[in-house]
Regions:
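Regulatory cytosolic signal-relay segments
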Residues: 227-230, 236-296
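Catalytic NTP-binding/metal-coordinating core of nucleotidyl cyclase/transferase enzymes
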Residues: 284-362
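Catalytic/regulatory signature loops of cyclic-dinucleotide turnover enzymes
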Residues: 374, 390, 410-433
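Cytosolic regulatory/linker segments at or just downstream of nucleotide-handling modules
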Residues: 423-468
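N-terminal alpha-helical interaction blocks
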Residues: 1-66
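Long, charge-rich boundary regions
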Residues: 106-195
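Catalytic core of nucleotidyl cyclases, primarily class III adenylyl/guanylyl cyclases
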Residues: 302-303, 334-362, 373-409
Length: 468
């Protein structure tokens, strides 16, 4: 049995069999580019498999060494990768900028960071493992662009339609290009160093030769648009890096606009942090101590088992422990099935996160029914949950050696839960205002009741809604 066969046999012990079979087939038969920067959501859609099963299988495959995981900071405008990271620990900048789009971005995990998967060279070597050997078109496909852009099969042909001139420039070398500039906006761009120089070619045509020099190095500096006239240009390109660069002169035409507008869903860092398989595998090695990464919108659910002290007194420690343990098992099962993750348990309480408010609401409705059913089955009618939900911004941090969250959103969610009566779900306005939440509540015949309350540590009163 080969090493790959041994690894896939091990993967079958922890992942869905259909997904494992698909991944093994891809590693064996798929073209190189299909095994580089794999988009888990796109892969699930193409193969007709459940997204969460594909994500879980890929995460377990990373743990076994079959695939490698990359956290790519990407430009929201052009979908180019601004920084590729083997771990969230190396996202150490507060802002990233894209020279091609002249745009800057605050580092957030909501939609700026994608997570992709590439086959490990120990299982199969692919061209992307040696990017210096890639053609220009394949460098753009496999290195520069993120998995958020839906690149056409004939990418090389499409790039030809936007490229006035290009060159593969070795380290330390210089090239001189003679061009005849058309009117319009042109971009001298290199995908390796992310260097861009914009040219505004307008006005009357000239017969006199114009001159321009562009230097490529590892330092990105803001550049102003240079005004030129249509006509001849002597363009000097100098590579001052220790690797090849791939500068090209692009025309900002409709073909380029159409290419950049082709998008598909991605596995975001935020979604992965709310994945239970990820937390189970990587909860202690996600962020560096002291590192803080911002999330603009995350939904927190807190639950607490009402009357647990009386339960211990009534049925005894052994029976009560079994009931509480079963309660934790059921809650985690429901949370995971609604695409959430348990962050931690505190006594009889659970703290969980969800990517969107509606998934937290769906989980909460199921959780309280599951507790009623469990209480009835065990003939202990007092198994009732108090649940609170809030959505807002927060920081992903490391606390007590585990990945956790910090901020006012977490505090409010916890305090909202303390307002819940037996079997009630108390949520904040941001949760109820979510369109998917409203549709879910309506489909379940539930009408939230508004009230204004004071929360400890919060200066102003807060609008909360009770779902009975």
């Amino acid at each position: 049995m080969s090493e790959a066969e041994t690894l896939f046999a091990a993967l079958r012990q922890s992942a869905n069999g259909d997904v494992v079979e698909m991944l093994e087939r891809m590693v064996r038969d798929a073209p190189d580019h299909a095994l580089n920067k794999m988009n888990a959501l796109d892969l699930a859609a193409r193969e007709g498999l459940a997204e969460e099963r594909v994500v879980a299988a890929l995460l377990n495959a990373v743990a076994l060494g079959i695939f490698e995981m990359t956290w790519n900071v990407m430009c929201l405008s052009c979908a180019g990768v601004l920084s590729a990271n083997k771990s969230l620990k190396t996202l150490d900048r507060r802002q990233y900028s894209c020279a091609f789009c002249a745009a800057g971005y605050e580092t957030t995990l909501d939609n700026l960071v994608e997570v992709t998967f590439t086959v490990s060279p120990r299982v199969r070597r692919i061209a992307a493992h040696s990017p210096d050997g890639l053609s220009v078109a394949e460098y753009y496909r496999q290195v520069f662009w993120s998995s958020a852009i839906d690149l056409p099969a004939d990418l090389e042909k499409v790039l030809d339609e936007v490229t006035l001139e290009s060159v593969d420039l070795p380290p330390g070398e210089r090239a001189i290009l003679s061009l005849n500039l058309p009117a319009g906006t042109l971009i001298v761009f290199d995908p390796v160093t992310h260097t861009a120089q914009f040219l505004d070619v307008s006005g009357g045509e000239t017969n006199e030769r114009q001159n321009l020099s562009v230097i490529f190095n590892k330092v990105q500096v803001p550049v102003e648009t240079i005004a030129l006239h249509p006509g001849p240009l002597r363009l000097t390109l100098e590579n001052r890096t220790d690797s090849r660069v791939l500068p090209a002169v692009w025309m900002a035409n409709q073909v380029l606009d159409n290419l950049l507008s082709r998008r598909k869903p991605i596995l975001t860092a935020k979604r992965l942090l709310t994945n239970q398989t990820f937390r189970d595998l990587y909860r202690t090695d996600t962020l560096a101590i002291g590192q803080r990464l911002k999330i603009l919108s995350l939904t927190f659910l807190f639950s607490d088992l009402k009357g647990s002290t009386e339960l211990y007194e009534r049925v005894g420690d052994l029976v009560a422990f079994d009931l509480v343990d079963e309660h934790f098992r059921l809650l985690q099962e429901i949370i995971v099935s609604e695409r959430g993750a348990v962050v931690k348990t505190i006594g009889d309480a659970v703290m969980a996160t969800f990517e969107t408010p509606d998934r937290a609401i769906a989980a909460a409705i199921r959780m309280r029914e599951a507790m009623s059913d469990l209480g009835a089955q065990r003939q202990h009618q007092s198994l009732r949950l108090k649940i609170g939900i809030h959505e807002g911004s927060c920081l992903a941090v490391t606390l007590n050696a585990q990945q956790d969250y910090f901020g006012q959103t977490v505090n409010i969610a916890s305090r909202v839960q303390s307002l819940a009566a037996s079997r009630s779900i108390v949520v904040t306005k941001s949760v109820v205002d979510n369109a998917q939440t409203q549709a879910l509540l309506a489909s379940n015949g539930l009408k939230p009741a508004l009230k204004r309350v004071a929360l400890s540590g919060i200066e102003d009163e807060v609008s909360v809604y009770e779902i009975s």
